[in-house]
Amino acid sequence: MTYRPATDPPDLDTLTLGVEEEFLLLDSDTGESMPVAARVLDGLSGTAYEQSRREFRHSMVEMVTPVVSDLAELRRHLVALRTAAAEAAESAGAHLVAVGATPVNETHRTVPDEPRYHAMSRRFGPVAHDPAVCGCHVHVGLPDRELAVQVCNHLRPWLPVVQAITANSPLHDGQDTGHASWRAMQLERWPSIGPTPYFDSAADYDATVADLIKAGIMLDAGMVYWYVRPSAAFPTVEIRVGDVCPTVDDTVLVAALVRALVATLAADVRDGARATRIRGCLVSAAHWRAAHDGLDGDLVDLRTGHARPAWDLVDELFALVAPALERQGDRAYVLDQLARLRDEGTGAARQRRILERTGCDVRAVLAHLAAQTRPVPA
Protein backbone atom coordinates (compact mmCIF):
# COMPACT_ATOMS: atom_id res chain seq x y z
CA MET A 1 0.00 0.00 0.00
CA THR A 2 1.02 3.64 -0.38
CA TYR A 3 1.35 5.46 2.92
CA ARG A 4 -0.71 8.63 3.18
CA PRO A 5 0.46 10.92 5.99
CA ALA A 6 -1.76 12.10 8.81
CA THR A 7 -2.96 15.68 8.80
CA ASP A 8 -0.50 16.61 11.53
CA PRO A 9 2.40 14.12 11.36
CA PRO A 10 4.72 13.88 14.39
CA ASP A 11 8.21 15.37 14.47
CA LEU A 12 10.34 12.24 14.12
CA ASP A 13 13.27 13.83 15.96
CA THR A 14 11.25 14.35 19.15
CA LEU A 15 9.31 11.11 19.53
CA THR A 16 8.22 10.39 23.08
CA LEU A 17 9.14 7.29 25.07
CA GLY A 18 7.67 5.12 27.77
CA VAL A 19 8.97 1.89 29.28
CA GLU A 20 7.27 -0.97 31.12
CA GLU A 21 9.50 -3.27 33.18
CA GLU A 22 8.33 -6.55 34.72
CA PHE A 23 10.10 -7.99 37.76
CA LEU A 24 10.09 -11.22 39.75
CA LEU A 25 9.82 -11.37 43.53
CA LEU A 26 12.21 -14.05 44.74
CA ASP A 27 13.20 -15.56 48.07
CA SER A 28 16.65 -14.24 48.96
CA ASP A 29 17.78 -17.63 50.33
CA THR A 30 16.30 -20.18 47.94
CA GLY A 31 15.63 -18.10 44.84
CA GLU A 32 12.10 -19.47 44.64
CA SER A 33 9.26 -17.18 43.63
CA MET A 34 7.38 -15.49 46.46
CA PRO A 35 3.65 -14.67 46.06
CA VAL A 36 3.91 -11.28 47.79
CA ALA A 37 3.03 -8.91 44.95
CA ALA A 38 0.01 -7.50 46.80
CA ARG A 39 2.18 -6.63 49.80
CA VAL A 40 4.80 -5.04 47.57
CA LEU A 41 2.26 -2.89 45.74
CA ASP A 42 0.63 -1.88 49.03
CA GLY A 43 4.08 -0.85 50.26
CA LEU A 44 4.49 1.68 47.47
CA SER A 45 3.35 5.28 47.73
CA GLY A 46 3.07 8.41 45.64
CA THR A 47 4.27 8.23 42.07
CA ALA A 48 5.71 4.74 42.50
CA TYR A 49 2.30 3.40 43.52
CA GLU A 50 0.57 5.21 40.65
CA GLN A 51 3.11 3.80 38.17
CA SER A 52 2.89 0.21 39.44
CA ARG A 53 0.78 -2.57 37.96
CA ARG A 54 -0.41 -5.99 39.09
CA GLU A 55 0.79 -8.77 36.80
CA PHE A 56 -0.24 -12.28 35.78
CA ARG A 57 1.44 -13.84 38.83
CA HIS A 58 1.38 -13.15 42.55
CA SER A 59 5.19 -13.19 42.33
CA MET A 60 5.46 -10.40 39.74
CA VAL A 61 5.12 -6.64 39.61
CA GLU A 62 5.34 -4.19 36.74
CA MET A 63 6.63 -0.63 36.95
CA VAL A 64 5.66 1.81 34.21
CA THR A 65 7.41 5.10 33.49
CA PRO A 66 5.48 8.21 32.55
CA VAL A 67 5.77 9.45 28.97
CA VAL A 68 9.14 11.18 28.58
CA SER A 69 10.96 13.07 25.87
CA ASP A 70 14.64 12.46 26.64
CA LEU A 71 16.90 9.71 27.97
CA ALA A 72 17.98 11.56 31.10
CA GLU A 73 14.35 11.90 32.17
CA LEU A 74 13.71 8.25 31.34
CA ARG A 75 16.68 7.17 33.42
CA ARG A 76 15.54 9.22 36.43
CA HIS A 77 12.13 7.56 36.37
CA LEU A 78 13.58 4.06 35.95
CA VAL A 79 15.95 4.59 38.89
CA ALA A 80 13.17 5.94 41.11
CA LEU A 81 10.71 3.18 40.22
CA ARG A 82 13.22 0.34 40.63
CA THR A 83 14.44 1.75 43.93
CA ALA A 84 10.93 2.10 45.34
CA ALA A 85 9.91 -1.38 44.19
CA ALA A 86 13.11 -2.95 45.57
CA GLU A 87 12.55 -1.33 48.96
CA ALA A 88 8.93 -2.47 49.05
CA ALA A 89 10.01 -5.99 48.09
CA GLU A 90 12.57 -6.07 50.89
CA SER A 91 9.90 -5.00 53.36
CA ALA A 92 7.85 -7.98 52.14
CA GLY A 93 10.82 -10.32 52.61
CA ALA A 94 11.67 -10.68 48.92
CA HIS A 95 14.22 -9.55 46.38
CA LEU A 96 13.12 -7.58 43.33
CA VAL A 97 14.86 -9.28 40.41
CA ALA A 98 15.11 -8.19 36.77
CA VAL A 99 15.42 -11.51 34.95
CA GLY A 100 13.57 -12.76 31.89
CA ALA A 101 12.43 -16.16 33.19
CA THR A 102 11.90 -17.83 36.55
CA PRO A 103 15.43 -19.12 37.32
CA VAL A 104 14.76 -21.68 40.06
CA ASN A 105 11.24 -22.72 40.91
CA GLU A 106 7.75 -21.28 41.15
CA THR A 107 5.74 -23.16 43.73
CA HIS A 108 2.74 -20.83 43.64
CA ARG A 109 1.39 -20.49 40.09
CA THR A 110 -2.13 -19.30 40.75
CA VAL A 111 -3.18 -16.15 38.95
CA PRO A 112 -4.46 -13.04 40.75
CA ASP A 113 -8.18 -12.92 41.43
CA GLU A 114 -9.17 -10.82 38.43
CA PRO A 115 -11.81 -11.83 35.83
CA ARG A 116 -9.50 -11.37 32.84
CA TYR A 117 -6.75 -13.52 34.33
CA HIS A 118 -9.22 -16.25 35.24
CA ALA A 119 -10.63 -16.17 31.70
CA MET A 120 -7.11 -16.58 30.28
CA SER A 121 -6.45 -19.45 32.68
CA ARG A 122 -9.64 -21.25 31.66
CA ARG A 123 -9.03 -20.73 27.95
CA PHE A 124 -5.34 -21.63 27.74
CA GLY A 125 -5.04 -24.17 30.55
CA PRO A 126 -1.56 -25.24 31.71
CA VAL A 127 0.14 -22.74 29.39
CA ALA A 128 -1.26 -19.97 31.56
CA HIS A 129 0.45 -21.57 34.54
CA ASP A 130 3.94 -21.86 33.10
CA PRO A 131 6.64 -20.28 35.29
CA ALA A 132 6.54 -16.49 35.24
CA VAL A 133 8.50 -14.54 32.63
CA CYS A 134 9.40 -10.85 32.56
CA GLY A 135 9.79 -8.52 29.62
CA CYS A 136 10.73 -4.95 28.85
CA HIS A 137 8.23 -3.15 26.64
CA VAL A 138 9.28 0.10 24.96
CA HIS A 139 6.59 2.48 23.69
CA VAL A 140 7.50 5.08 21.07
CA GLY A 141 4.92 7.79 20.41
CA LEU A 142 3.52 7.47 16.88
CA PRO A 143 -0.13 8.59 16.80
CA ASP A 144 -0.57 8.00 13.05
CA ARG A 145 -1.81 4.40 13.15
CA GLU A 146 -1.28 3.74 9.45
CA LEU A 147 2.31 4.86 9.83
CA ALA A 148 2.66 2.71 12.96
CA VAL A 149 1.59 -0.44 11.09
CA GLN A 150 4.05 0.23 8.27
CA VAL A 151 6.84 0.88 10.77
CA CYS A 152 6.06 -2.50 12.35
CA ASN A 153 6.64 -4.08 8.92
CA HIS A 154 9.99 -2.31 8.55
CA LEU A 155 11.06 -3.30 12.07
CA ARG A 156 10.85 -7.05 11.40
CA PRO A 157 14.46 -7.52 10.16
CA TRP A 158 15.89 -5.72 13.19
CA LEU A 159 13.88 -7.18 16.06
CA PRO A 160 16.05 -10.32 16.42
CA VAL A 161 19.01 -7.99 17.01
CA VAL A 162 17.10 -6.16 19.74
CA GLN A 163 16.10 -9.53 21.20
CA ALA A 164 19.73 -10.66 21.30
CA ILE A 165 20.83 -7.44 23.02
CA THR A 166 18.26 -7.96 25.79
CA ALA A 167 18.82 -11.71 26.32
CA ASN A 168 18.69 -12.16 30.10
CA SER A 169 17.20 -15.56 30.96
CA PRO A 170 19.57 -18.53 30.54
CA LEU A 171 18.34 -20.39 33.63
CA HIS A 172 15.28 -22.58 34.17
CA ASP A 173 14.65 -24.88 37.13
CA GLY A 174 18.13 -24.06 38.42
CA GLN A 175 19.89 -25.23 35.24
CA ASP A 176 21.50 -23.50 32.28
CA THR A 177 19.12 -24.11 29.37
CA GLY A 178 21.71 -23.45 26.68
CA HIS A 179 19.54 -20.53 25.53
CA ALA A 180 20.35 -16.90 26.20
CA SER A 181 16.61 -16.13 26.47
CA TRP A 182 14.58 -19.00 27.87
CA ARG A 183 11.70 -16.54 28.17
CA ALA A 184 11.38 -16.50 24.39
CA MET A 185 11.29 -20.29 24.24
CA GLN A 186 8.65 -20.53 26.94
CA LEU A 187 6.40 -17.88 25.40
CA GLU A 188 6.19 -19.81 22.12
CA ARG A 189 3.52 -21.97 23.77
CA TRP A 190 1.06 -19.05 23.58
CA PRO A 191 -0.84 -18.77 20.29
CA SER A 192 -0.69 -14.97 20.06
CA ILE A 193 2.98 -14.40 20.96
CA GLY A 194 5.81 -14.30 18.47
CA PRO A 195 6.98 -12.48 15.36
CA THR A 196 4.60 -9.89 14.01
CA PRO A 197 3.10 -10.78 10.62
CA TYR A 198 3.37 -8.42 7.66
CA PHE A 199 0.28 -6.23 7.22
CA ASP A 200 -0.72 -4.23 4.15
CA SER A 201 -2.50 -1.56 6.16
CA ALA A 202 -4.07 -0.70 9.49
CA ALA A 203 -7.34 -2.11 8.14
CA ASP A 204 -5.56 -5.38 7.33
CA TYR A 205 -4.13 -5.45 10.85
CA ASP A 206 -7.54 -4.82 12.44
CA ALA A 207 -9.25 -7.44 10.27
CA THR A 208 -6.64 -10.05 11.17
CA VAL A 209 -6.97 -9.35 14.88
CA ALA A 210 -10.77 -9.56 14.60
CA ASP A 211 -10.47 -12.92 12.84
CA LEU A 212 -8.14 -14.26 15.54
CA ILE A 213 -10.56 -13.19 18.26
CA LYS A 214 -13.47 -14.85 16.45
CA ALA A 215 -11.38 -18.01 16.09
CA GLY A 216 -10.76 -18.12 19.84
CA ILE A 217 -7.01 -17.59 19.52
CA MET A 218 -7.14 -14.56 21.81
CA LEU A 219 -9.75 -13.12 24.13
CA ASP A 220 -9.53 -9.57 22.80
CA ALA A 221 -7.21 -7.10 21.07
CA GLY A 222 -5.28 -6.67 24.31
CA MET A 223 -3.96 -10.20 23.82
CA VAL A 224 -2.03 -9.28 20.68
CA TYR A 225 1.36 -10.08 22.18
CA TRP A 226 3.38 -9.98 18.98
CA TYR A 227 6.95 -8.73 19.23
CA VAL A 228 5.91 -5.32 17.92
CA ARG A 229 2.43 -3.90 17.59
CA PRO A 230 0.51 -0.66 17.40
CA SER A 231 -0.42 -0.44 21.06
CA ALA A 232 -3.99 -1.37 21.90
CA ALA A 233 -4.10 1.28 24.63
CA PHE A 234 -1.81 4.16 23.57
CA PRO A 235 -0.88 6.07 20.38
CA THR A 236 2.44 4.26 20.20
CA VAL A 237 4.44 1.55 18.53
CA GLU A 238 5.14 -0.99 21.28
CA ILE A 239 8.24 -3.19 21.03
CA ARG A 240 7.76 -6.25 23.25
CA VAL A 241 10.49 -8.61 22.04
CA GLY A 242 13.01 -8.15 24.84
CA ASP A 243 13.65 -9.77 28.19
CA VAL A 244 13.58 -7.32 31.08
CA CYS A 245 17.04 -5.78 31.22
CA PRO A 246 19.31 -6.42 34.22
CA THR A 247 20.27 -2.77 34.82
CA VAL A 248 18.83 0.67 34.26
CA ASP A 249 21.62 1.49 31.81
CA ASP A 250 20.74 -1.60 29.77
CA THR A 251 17.11 -0.50 29.61
CA VAL A 252 17.97 3.05 28.58
CA LEU A 253 20.28 1.73 25.85
CA VAL A 254 17.52 -0.44 24.40
CA ALA A 255 14.99 2.40 24.60
CA ALA A 256 17.38 4.76 22.81
CA LEU A 257 18.09 2.28 20.02
CA VAL A 258 14.41 1.47 19.59
CA ARG A 259 13.31 5.10 19.45
CA ALA A 260 16.00 5.96 16.91
CA LEU A 261 15.07 2.90 14.86
CA VAL A 262 11.38 3.84 14.83
CA ALA A 263 12.27 7.41 13.81
CA THR A 264 14.56 6.18 11.02
CA LEU A 265 12.08 3.68 9.63
CA ALA A 266 9.13 6.09 9.91
CA ALA A 267 11.09 8.54 7.77
CA ASP A 268 11.69 5.76 5.23
CA VAL A 269 7.95 5.03 5.11
CA ARG A 270 7.17 8.70 4.55
CA ASP A 271 9.67 8.70 1.69
CA GLY A 272 7.80 5.85 0.03
CA ALA A 273 9.96 2.89 1.05
CA ARG A 274 8.18 -0.45 1.15
CA ALA A 275 9.08 -3.14 3.66
CA THR A 276 10.29 -6.46 2.30
CA ARG A 277 7.88 -9.35 2.80
CA ILE A 278 10.08 -11.84 4.64
CA ARG A 279 8.94 -15.45 4.90
CA GLY A 280 7.43 -16.16 8.29
CA CYS A 281 9.46 -19.33 8.80
CA LEU A 282 12.69 -17.38 8.30
CA VAL A 283 11.61 -14.67 10.75
CA SER A 284 10.76 -17.33 13.34
CA ALA A 285 14.13 -19.00 12.78
CA ALA A 286 15.91 -15.67 13.24
CA HIS A 287 14.19 -15.12 16.57
CA TRP A 288 15.02 -18.66 17.69
CA ARG A 289 18.69 -18.03 16.88
CA ALA A 290 18.64 -14.71 18.74
CA ALA A 291 17.08 -16.35 21.80
CA HIS A 292 19.61 -19.18 21.67
CA ASP A 293 22.86 -17.30 20.99
CA GLY A 294 22.22 -13.81 22.30
CA LEU A 295 25.26 -11.79 21.24
CA ASP A 296 27.71 -14.65 21.76
CA GLY A 297 27.28 -16.31 18.38
CA ASP A 298 25.59 -15.69 15.06
CA LEU A 299 22.29 -14.09 14.16
CA VAL A 300 20.24 -14.47 11.01
CA ASP A 301 20.43 -11.37 8.84
CA LEU A 302 16.84 -11.22 7.63
CA ARG A 303 17.81 -8.94 4.75
CA THR A 304 19.83 -11.79 3.20
CA GLY A 305 18.79 -14.95 5.05
CA HIS A 306 22.41 -15.65 5.99
CA ALA A 307 23.94 -16.22 9.43
CA ARG A 308 26.39 -13.51 10.49
CA PRO A 309 28.28 -12.65 13.68
CA ALA A 310 25.86 -11.02 16.11
CA TRP A 311 28.03 -7.99 16.75
CA ASP A 312 28.29 -7.26 13.02
CA LEU A 313 24.52 -6.79 12.98
CA VAL A 314 24.61 -4.68 16.14
CA ASP A 315 27.19 -2.44 14.47
CA GLU A 316 25.00 -2.17 11.36
CA LEU A 317 21.98 -1.34 13.50
CA PHE A 318 23.96 1.47 15.12
CA ALA A 319 25.12 2.75 11.73
CA LEU A 320 21.51 2.79 10.52
CA VAL A 321 20.19 4.79 13.47
CA ALA A 322 23.25 6.98 14.14
CA PRO A 323 21.84 10.02 12.27
CA ALA A 324 18.61 9.85 14.28
CA LEU A 325 20.58 9.41 17.50
CA GLU A 326 22.67 12.46 16.59
CA ARG A 327 19.57 14.58 16.03
CA GLN A 328 18.09 13.34 19.31
CA GLY A 329 21.33 14.09 21.19
CA ASP A 330 21.81 10.43 22.13
CA ARG A 331 24.61 9.24 19.85
CA ALA A 332 27.52 9.56 22.30
CA TYR A 333 25.56 7.91 25.11
CA VAL A 334 24.53 4.95 22.96
CA LEU A 335 28.07 4.52 21.64
CA ASP A 336 29.42 4.40 25.21
CA GLN A 337 26.75 1.94 26.32
CA LEU A 338 27.34 -0.35 23.35
CA ALA A 339 31.05 -0.40 24.23
CA ARG A 340 30.10 -1.38 27.79
CA LEU A 341 27.76 -4.08 26.51
CA ARG A 342 30.48 -5.45 24.25
CA ASP A 343 32.79 -5.63 27.27
CA GLU A 344 30.30 -6.99 29.84
CA GLY A 345 28.11 -9.09 27.58
CA THR A 346 24.36 -9.57 27.77
CA GLY A 347 22.56 -10.33 31.00
CA ALA A 348 22.71 -14.01 30.05
CA ALA A 349 26.47 -13.87 29.53
CA ARG A 350 26.97 -12.16 32.89
CA GLN A 351 24.97 -14.87 34.65
CA ARG A 352 26.99 -17.61 32.98
CA ARG A 353 30.28 -16.06 34.03
CA ILE A 354 29.12 -16.21 37.65
CA LEU A 355 28.05 -19.83 37.23
CA GLU A 356 31.47 -20.68 35.85
CA ARG A 357 33.32 -18.73 38.54
CA THR A 358 31.33 -20.20 41.44
CA GLY A 359 30.99 -23.79 40.30
CA CYS A 360 27.36 -23.42 39.20
CA ASP A 361 26.18 -21.66 42.36
CA VAL A 362 22.73 -20.46 41.31
CA ARG A 363 22.32 -18.53 44.57
CA ALA A 364 25.34 -16.41 43.62
CA VAL A 365 23.67 -15.63 40.30
CA LEU A 366 20.46 -14.61 42.04
CA ALA A 367 22.34 -12.34 44.45
CA HIS A 368 24.06 -10.74 41.47
CA LEU A 369 20.74 -10.24 39.69
CA ALA A 370 19.13 -8.61 42.72
CA ALA A 371 22.11 -6.29 43.15
CA GLN A 372 22.02 -5.27 39.48
CA THR A 373 18.28 -4.66 39.56
CA ARG A 374 18.49 -2.07 42.31
CA PRO A 375 20.27 1.09 41.13
CA VAL A 376 23.29 2.27 43.11
CA PRO A 377 22.52 5.62 44.82
CA ALA A 378 24.19 8.54 43.07
Curated annotation (Swiss-Prot):
Gene3D superfamilies: 3.30.590.20. InterPro entries: GCL_type2/YbdK_subfam, GCS2, Gln_synth/guanido_kin_cat_dom, YbdK. Keywords: ATP-binding, Ligase, Nucleotide-binding. The keyword Chaperone does not apply. Its EC number is 6.3.2.2. It catalyses: L-cysteine + L-glutamate + ATP = gamma-L-glutamyl-L-cysteine + ADP + phosphate + H(+). One of its GO terms (biological process) is modified amino acid biosynthetic process. GO terms for molecular function: ATP binding; glutamate-cysteine ligase activity. It is an enzyme of class 6 (ligase). Belongs to the glutamate--cysteine ligase type 2 family. YbdK subfamily. NCBIfam families: gshA_cyan_rel (TIGR02050), PRK13517.1-1 (NF010041). ATP-dependent carboxylate-amine ligase which exhibits weak glutamate--cysteine ligase activity. HAMAP family: Glu_cys_ligase_2. This is Putative glutamate--cysteine ligase 2.
